[in-house]
């Protein structure tokens, strides 16, 4: 298949392009270059915000630690890395999104080439969830306007070019729910939510990539599975935050975890490709119970292999969520996540 054939097929939605070379081809880890997906983007002279936190005014990145984590991935036979971009690159089309220490497009291109030379497939991630788009700065307050659509389209194209036209682009879109938006004056929902989501799907496909997303909008929206285009790759994430496990027959009918686990089955039945995501991150409930989450990925692999169609189970993603580059915690958390995924997959 030529690149022209791929783009034409994706744009027309005539067929879903081949996702993986073999079943469970993806052995992936989520890592972060940018960190301004959590916080408030406010004027420089505002030094604090009540009940929240401000975005970083500089890139929080340690290249030495980054390379150590990448080396661990290679040692443990990982083959794909999803990279949260956020404010980290200097986007050629919108350099105003950069912060102090953001890296040039040439640096990104060089690192992408290096990762490929190590046998890793780099996948760019641009989180367009309104709960995680502070990296867009003022444009994040222009949701559903022409300037917003233009900027989002431009940075998607930039990511495609900097990553040498990758197979996928992760659009984020997690935690689009009231509990994460209760401080907002306006909330994107219902028809407007769908309008913007479908805009991102089409824009990613028009740029020659396949859209990849967090699936949690489907936990509480029954129409999600029906309306979502089949071209979207689903990252349903389940971290077993409330210690309910994966056994639906043992869960109470009103268990918080039930809709999360059930969504794996619904997506599979509807014919979606999936890359289920687990984590070694510990929720407050787990910390209170003094229960580690080191077995979450192994339990997920066992559940998914037993219950999902092999042809649609395209691999697994580990999300350690080791955000800050504090050497001890950063390496410990990422190494543990990588090792747990490697052990679970065998």
Question: In which residue ranges do the predicted regions lie?
Answer:
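Transmembrane beta-strand segments of Gram-negative outer membrane beta-barrel proteins
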Residues: 23-31
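Aromatic-lined carbohydrate-binding surfaces of glycoside hydrolases
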Residues: 30-233, 238, 281
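N-terminal export signals
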Residues: 5-20
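Well-ordered, non-membrane alpha-helical segments in soluble/globular domains
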Residues: 62, 66, 104-108, 148-153, ...
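Short loop/turn motifs at secondary-structure junctions
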Residues: 25, 77, 163-167, 307-312
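Glycoside hydrolase catalytic-domain groove-lining segments
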Residues: 222-229, 235-280
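Substrate-binding cleft of secreted/luminal carbohydrate-active enzymes
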Residues: 275-286, 291-346
């Amino acid at each position: 298949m030529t690149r022209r054939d791929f783009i034409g097929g994706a744009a027309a939605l005539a067929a879903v392009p081949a996702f993986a070379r073999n079943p469970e081809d993806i052995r992936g880890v989520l890592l972060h270059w940018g960190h301004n997906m959590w916080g408030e983007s406010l004027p420089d002279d505002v030094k604090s915000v009540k009940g929240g936190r401000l975005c970083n005014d500089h890139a929080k990145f340690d290249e030495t630690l980054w390379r150590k984590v990448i080396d661990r991935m290679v040692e443990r036979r990982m083959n794909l890395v999803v990279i949260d971009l956020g404010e980290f690159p200097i986007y050629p089309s919108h350099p105003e999104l950069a912060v102090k220490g953001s890296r040039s497009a040439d640096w990104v291109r060089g690192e992408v080439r290096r990762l490929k030379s190590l046998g890793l497939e780099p996948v760019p991630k641009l989180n367009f969830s309104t709960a995680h788009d502070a990296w867009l700065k003022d444009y994040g307050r222009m949701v559903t306007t022409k300037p917003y659509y233009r900027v989002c389209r431009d940075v998607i194209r930039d990511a495609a070019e900097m990553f040498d036209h990758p197979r996928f682009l992760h659009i984020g879109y997690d935690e689009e729910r009231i509990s994460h938006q209760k401080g907002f004056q306006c909330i994107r929902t219902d028809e407007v939510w769908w309008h913007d989501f479908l805009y991102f799907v089409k824009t990613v496909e028009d740029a020659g990539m396949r859209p990849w997303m967090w699936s949690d909008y489907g936990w509480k929206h029954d129409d999600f599975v029906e309306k979502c285009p089949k071209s979207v790759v689903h990252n349903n994430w389940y971290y077993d935050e409330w210690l309910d496990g994966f056994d639906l027959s043992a869960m109470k009918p009103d268990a918080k975890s039930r809709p999360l686990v059930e969504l794996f089955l619904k997506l599979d039945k509807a014919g979606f490709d999936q890359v289920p995501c687990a984590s070694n991150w510990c929720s407050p409930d787990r910390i209170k119970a003094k229960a580690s989450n080191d077995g979450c990925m192994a339990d997920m692999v066992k559940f998914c292999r037993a219950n999902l169609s092999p042809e649609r189970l395209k691999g697994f993603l580990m999300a350690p969520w080791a955000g800050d580059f504090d050497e001890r915690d950063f390496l410990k958390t990422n190494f543990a996540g990588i090792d747990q995924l490697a052990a679970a997959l065998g």
